[in-house]
Amino acid sequence: MRQRSGIRHRWWIGLACLGCVLHHTDAAAQGPSGGPLTLNDAIQLALRNYPAIKESRARAQAAEEGVGVARTAYLPRLDMMWQENRATTNNVFGLLFPQSTLFSMTGPVLGTRSLGDSVWGSAGAVLLSWEAVDFGQRKAGVDVARAQTSLAKNQSALTELDVASAAADAFLTVLAADESVRAARANVDRLQVFSNNVRTLVQNQLRPGADQSRAEAELAVANNQLSQAVQIAEVARASLADAVGAAGASFELTAGALTAVPEFTIEPADLTTHPAARAGQAAIDVVRARERTLDRAYYPHITLQSTFAARGSGAETPGVSSFGNGLWVQVPNWAVGASVTFPALDLFSINARKRVEAQNEVAESAHYDRTIQALTTQEVKARALMKAATEIARNTPAERQAATAGENQARARYQSGLATVVEVAEAHRLLAQAEADDAVARLGVWRALLATAQAHGDLAPFLDRIKP
């Protein structure tokens, strides 16, 4: 009885998990508004979910936080130290160059050499230092951080443009693939009817058996073409799911305004405002900001300092009263002053770094010129694509009408014995191609508009045309 109850319990858990999976799948198959996915929904999903968008935005935010890091150089520095030690008191006169290995001794020479006698020592200090005058070095560092922030933001804008364009193009590709599937399925239906008619005529010995074989072969070819069209549509949907950042999800699409051929006028664009061009210019600005930092590097540093310190020692000096066991500080001191430091020999390294940055500026300027050239070429190609797509969209209705009339006439002539099955098959093939061309031609114009908007660096005019 317990075993049967456990089995029933596992069944309920399995059904609950299956329901959660199905609910998640249904939710993923819907657009943000809960209905079929529109092109604008696809773009918004991509901008919200695609990993590259999150990465670029995070990098831009990190660069912006870097400005705050650079500004902290204006703050004073406060160092605190406390020390407890036990050591011998042997000391000698003499000089030691500054180094980090041998510890220093303070106090008079006692003339002792014993390693067995040791005392406690303590020390504490607070040092406040502030660079009062830097001749613009810290400001130059902040300017570098701001230039890097501008570069990161422009790169993020370019990423958003690329991701949104890819999502829109994938959406149009799915619509075109679905239209091709409809045309292929209509062709299969027509050829199925024609094949049945030919079979009846052959069975009644009104047509030779070769006609039936040809009709069945044409039907098989049409079915294969339908399978290929379905495959292309499924692959296109997978690409759309990836483009919107929901890989593996399935969406129901609605064409909306994309079913009609749009009316448009293409205005000339300033390619220097394209996100790619702005990112290239920002990269040049970063190099120039680093060059200005190097211009300020060969200047002195004027630092104000103040300190309070105290020490204690268990060592006894002849003629001086004892300060206790040395575990606590007993002798205080304070000091206030200013120091000037000047990196005299840094001139050589600074000049070498300037030569490096000069070549970096040449490289970034060349990259900017290449970007402008690529954008110009992209715009010219988009205009050519627009011209061809518009002409094709004007011609396909006539193509479809003529192909439909030709197919009707070929079937009628075949029924009357005035045409061969080859003529009918060719008419069917021509009609199928005409239907596919007509269905895809409208989307071709929209795709050309998308390519033009992407070349101009702004999808807003394209999205305004698809609003209901």
Briefly describe each language-model feature range:
Residues 12-23:
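Bacterial N-terminal signal peptides
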Residues 28-84, 89-92, 131-132, 248, ...:
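Bacterial Sec-pathway N-terminal export signals of envelope proteins
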Residues 36-38, 77-158, 278-290, 297-371, ...:
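Small/polar-residue-enriched beta-strand and adjacent coil segments characteristic
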Residues 205, 245, 417, 456-457:
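Short helix-capping/hinge motifs at transmembrane helix termini and TM-loop junctions
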Residues 73-75, 163, 208, 298:
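Short, glycine-/polar-rich solvent-exposed loops and beta-turns at beta-strand/coil boundaries
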Residues 2-14:
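Bacterial N-terminal signal peptides that target proteins for export
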Residues 2, 159-273, 385, 389, ...:
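Periplasmic alpha-helical coiled-coil/stalk elements that build and connect Gram-negative outer-membrane
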Residues 55-70, 159, 163-182, 193, ...:
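Amphipathic alpha-helical coiled-coil segments
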